[in-house]
């Protein structure tokens, strides 16, 4: 059957059966008849459905969606790469989007879980794919969104809830650090982190210039991160509320005074226009989240 698409380009479809009552010839795969396919195409054309666009793969659709927004944070870019790589290594990635049903999307989620992906990661990926398929609906490529379902209906949320330390637990931990031969050198940094409530990347990004000791205020307008590919880099807050001035408590102020007094010599490093970072490792380079993750794990193990 030959038909002309809305842009004037001829398209062809084939079937080994003319009408539904015809038998499938020996050696041929069972398929709907040509007349049924013809009826589907006529309905799609009448409804303005892009039958050609519906043949793009899930990978192509996700790439098209990503190309709609280029100005993104590096963490978002890395997340996109991870999802694209997972799609390329999964049967779903090469499927035409007009063939993907909700059962296929649910089977994808189950496969992801079996591969060891965390529930939250799968949920984030599902949200991205749902947005991609929504774009395909808006572009009249498909009618329904196969990712329009609750992940909790398919997988059990096994995410362990974060447990916040009580004030009493904080004090006991700090008392232990203050007298421990190994961890007492981190005491002031942990006090400062707990008192300010900063994100660890904001904490690591603090520079001497961000500190107003006279008015006891911190200026928070950037984060310091480190990547295996590009090394240190600076990120700015996603929203205006991320930029703020933070007043120091008396305890934070006292800890900061000791930190400045005991601070080693910084290497002449400039990252994204920022230098003279407050928290340094033994080489005089800025500490990053990974340094504190390792330290805190060791501390907790010894404390417990």
Enumerate the language-model features and the residues they cover.
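Basic, Lys/Arg- and aromatic-enriched nucleic-acid-binding interface segment
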Residues: 125, 138, 142-206, 214, ...
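Generic recognition of well-ordered alpha-helical segments
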Residues: 36-39, 82-86, 107, 127, ...
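N-terminal core-binding DNA-recognition domain of tyrosine site-specific recombinases/integrases
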Residues: 25-30, 66-141, 159, 181-182, ...
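Conserved hydrophobic/aromatic pocket- or pore-lining residues that grip, position, or stack substrates
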Residues: 62, 105, 129, 140, ...
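Phosphate-coordinating loops and pocket residues in cytosolic domains that bind phosphorylated ligands
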Residues: 63, 102, 114, 175, ...
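Conserved tyrosine-mediated DNA breakage-rejoining catalytic core shared by Y-recombinases
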Residues: 205-264
């Amino acid at each position: 059957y030959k038909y002309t698409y809305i842009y004037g380009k001829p398209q062809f479809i084939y079937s080994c059966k003319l009408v539904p009552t015809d038998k499938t010839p020996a050696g041929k795969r069972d398929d709907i008849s040509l007349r049924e396919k013809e009826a589907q195409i006529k309905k799609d054309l009448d409804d303005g459905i892009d039958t050609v666009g519906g043949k793009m793969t899930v990978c192509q659709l996700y790439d098209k969606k990503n190309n709609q927004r280029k100005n993104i944070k590096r963490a978002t870019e890395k997340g996109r790469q991870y999802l694209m790589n997972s799609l390329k290594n999964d049967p779903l990635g090469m499927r035409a989007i007009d063939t993907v049903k909700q059962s296929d999307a649910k089977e994808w989620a189950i496969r992801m879980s079996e591969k060891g992906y965390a529930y939250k990661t799968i949920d984030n990926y599902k949200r991205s794919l749902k947005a991609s398929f929504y774009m395909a609906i808006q572009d009249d490529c498909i009618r329904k969104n196969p990712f329009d379902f609750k992940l909790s209906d398919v997988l059990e949320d096994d995410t362990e809830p974060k447990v916040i330390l009580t004030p009493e637990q904080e004090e006991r931990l700090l008392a232990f650090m203050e007298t421990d031969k190994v961890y007492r050198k981190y005491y002031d940094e942990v006090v400062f982190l707990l008192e300010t409530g900063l994100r660890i990347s904001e904490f690591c990004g603090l520079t001497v210039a961000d500190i107003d000791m006279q008015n006891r205020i911190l200026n928070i307008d950037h984060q310091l991160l480190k990547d295996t590919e590009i090394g240190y880099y600076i990120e700015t807050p996603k929203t205006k509320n991320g930029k703020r001035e933070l007043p120091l408590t008396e305890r934070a102020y006292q800890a900061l005074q000791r930190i400045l007094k005991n601070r080693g010599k910084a290497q002449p490093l400039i990252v994204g226009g920022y230098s003279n970072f407050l928290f340094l490792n033994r080489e005089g380079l800025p500490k990053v989240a990974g340094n504190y993750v390792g330290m805190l794990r060791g501390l907790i193990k010894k404390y417990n």
